[in-house]
Regions:
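Mature catalytic core of soluble alpha/beta enzymes
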Residues: 1-181
Length: 181
């Protein structure tokens, strides 16, 4: 069963290859992504991150999810020597960490529900488990300068894949580096 929904400002596809999967199983994954969006959306006034950025919440009031993401963000900032930094002009934007983390959490939900063959794609970041039709999942990598062209096909099982065009990487690196000044 395969479904697509627009959540967190991006298309999210969930496909589970198992005869016992139900629409409710897939909906649980989408409900999880909606909950993540309610916590971390920079565009929702009521989100936890928006309240934090407005100074309306103190650290003791942060959700466990927020504490986890802030710790991961700090770890990543240290590992990249500051090139990845969620803070810019006093505002925290953890979206660069949240998407990948949320995909892994959603994959764990499916595994805990007993599913071993599935695909989750959230805005181009992908997590696969098991196989599709007895074969590894086939993931096409697009040319960043010609989105109609597939430059590489990966055959994968039990892997995560994230790609980005070089122009996007440069902007992210420069923005993060500038935020350290």
């Amino acid at each position: 069963m395969k479904q697509l929904q627009l959540l967190m400002g991006m298309p999210i596809t969930v496909e589970v290859v198992d005869p016992s999967v139900t629409e409710a199983d897939i909906e649980n994954v989408f409900a999880y992504f909606r909950a993540v969006d309610d916590i971390f959306s920079m565009y929702k006034e009521h989100s936890e991150i928006s309240k934090i950025n407005r100074g309306e919440l103190c650290e003791e009031e942060y959700s466990d999810e927020m504490k986890t993401i802030l710790a991961l963000s700090e770890q990543t900032r240290q590992e990249t020597r500051g090139y990845f930094n969620i803070y810019h002009n006093g505002i925290a934007d953890p979206s660069g960490i949240v998407k990948g983390w949320a995909i892994l959490q959603a994959a764990n939900m499916l595994k805990e529900a007993g599913f071993t063959n599935f695909y989750i794609d959230a805005g181009g970041d992908i997590q696969v488990a098991g196989k599709k039709g007895g074969n590894p999942w086939r993931i096409g990598i697009r040319n960043p300068f010609n989105r109609k062209e597939i430059v590489k096909v990966l055959a994968v099982t039990d892997k995560g894949i994230a790609t980005s065009g070089i122009a996007i990487r440069i902007i992210q690196l420069l923005r993060s580096r500038i935020s350290l000044a």
